Amino acid sequence: EQCIEDYFGIQIDRYARVNFYSFIDIVETVGGIDMEVSKAEAEGMKKPMAEQNKYLKNKKGTDYISDDIFAGKSDEDKVKLHLNGNQALAFARLRYVGNSDYERTERQRRVISEIITESKKLNLVQLDKLLNKVLPEINTDLTDGEIANLLLNAFDYMKYDIQQLRIPADGYFTNEVIYSMDVLNPDFAANSAFIQYIVYGSCKNIDEAIKQYQEENAYNYSYDTGYYGY
């Protein structure tokens, strides 16, 4: 948290953080989620699910997606499935299918979006039950009063649009190998600006933020590095 605040010039507050296995309970409490899953993803989910089953003391192979579902399909072909908590966690953790960590973070955003979608179907009593179930498993800086206010106004908040932002943004980082490790070296000045434009400013998406940043910093562009200066 402190590292992100220092490097990107933002204040992180009103956050909620859960661990792997609390995440399973959250998905189960909303009744599972619908997700488009490819044949390659279903196969790749088996490795993280094996780790989860061992931790949860489940029988080996529990919740594996049947190969029969994808009979005759290519690795890229997708099927809409209803995932339980164990399966949803494995799907969100999946890294070595597709474009590495980029697709993994995309899957994580898709899963979170679907959890929100399912939560919108709950009535006030069900939402209260959900909170009573998951709040003990969530680490947050929200006060009890703020949580109560969120619950009372939940139906209004659920009508809000959800904005997503991936950092570092395309074109504003370099791929490097440092100490034999693959790392992304971001243009911190640009990416900090993108976050601040969207969180605190008037930009609604990364494209608007990039355009605004380029307009404000055109005089300071380096053709040697491909970066806009500080």
Regions found by a protein language model. Give the residues of each.
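C-terminal solvent-exposed extensions
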Residues: 125-131, 137-230
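Structural recognition of the beta-strand scaffold that forms the well-ordered cores
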Residues: 14-17, 90-91, 163-166
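Solvent-exposed, acidic/flexible segments
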Residues: 1, 16-20, 81-85, 101-109, ...
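A mature extracytoplasmic/lumenal domain signature
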Residues: 16-22, 31, 39-41, 169-171
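Flexible, polar/acidic helix-loop-strand segments at domain edges
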Residues: 25-126
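Second-shell loop/turn segments in exported
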Residues: 4-14, 77-78, 94-103, 116-121, ...
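Solvent-exposed, polar/charged alpha-helical surfaces in well-ordered, non-transmembrane soluble domains
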Residues: 2-6, 13, 21-28, 90, ...
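Surface-exposed patches in mature extracellular/periplasmic domains of secreted proteins
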Residues: 12-19, 37-39, 123-130, 206-210
